[in-house]
Amino acid sequence: LKQFLFIFVPLFLVIAIQFLATYFAMGLSLLIENGWYSATGSAGFLDIVDDTFSLWSSQHFNTGVLLIYNAMSIAVFGLWYYCRYGGNYRPALRQTFHPAAIAGIVMLMPGTQYLTTYIMSFVAALFPHWMDAYESLLETAGLDDQISILMVVCSVIFAPFCEELVFRGVTMHQAKKCLPFWAANLLQALLFGIFHMNMIQGIYAFCLGLVLG
């Protein structure tokens, strides 16, 4: 039972790191704002509060939080995966660049993309308010038409690497200690979907997690 319950620890830990990164960035920005206005004496308390809340809702702030969160998560789960599960970060060149492996990836990824797109479109048609909530979340996170290059780097490179360490790395290896492969893969994909905390993205993440597992 202890081994099974330990499967859920990475999910709770990565969520805790998200909150820690957010509160750290909020506290640091508040300290800087107060220090700046105290030094210049150019604004009152309400102006400071208004500027601070505007900063917290900006794309630059969200990008900073994402950078801090990814750095912390990669450090924590990278060490966890390496030390506890003997993770190897050196690619096996013969297996990685084997023609069969490359062909499988070329066929698998577009197929997975089409499948998840159809599933998401079907779900969005049944529950349009889920799609509205998802689009609102993307705008709040800065993933809209005005997205910055740094946010693209965080979202396309750092975030997937972090998520692979958490779910296909630590969670999957822990799950395989007490469950057969199919059950371990199903559970890590389910936790991967839950981690995204919205239905549309969660369904997409669940389907993708099954394939990556």
Describe the residue ranges of each PLM region.
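Juxtamembrane helix-loop-helix connectors linking adjacent transmembrane helices
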Residues: 89-165, 173, 177
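Membrane-water interface at transmembrane helix exits
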Residues: 21-33, 81-85, 116-124, 162-163, ...
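N-terminal, membrane-interfacial amphipathic/helix-forming hydrophobic leader that caps
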Residues: 1-102
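Transmembrane helix-loop-helix hairpins at the membrane interface
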Residues: 148-213
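Hydrophobic faces of alpha-helical transmembrane segments in multi-pass integral membrane proteins
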Residues: 9-24, 28, 72, 107-111, ...
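Hydrophobic alpha-helical transmembrane segments
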Residues: 4-12, 63-67, 102-107, 149, ...
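Short alpha-helical linear motifs
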Residues: 31-36, 129, 209-213
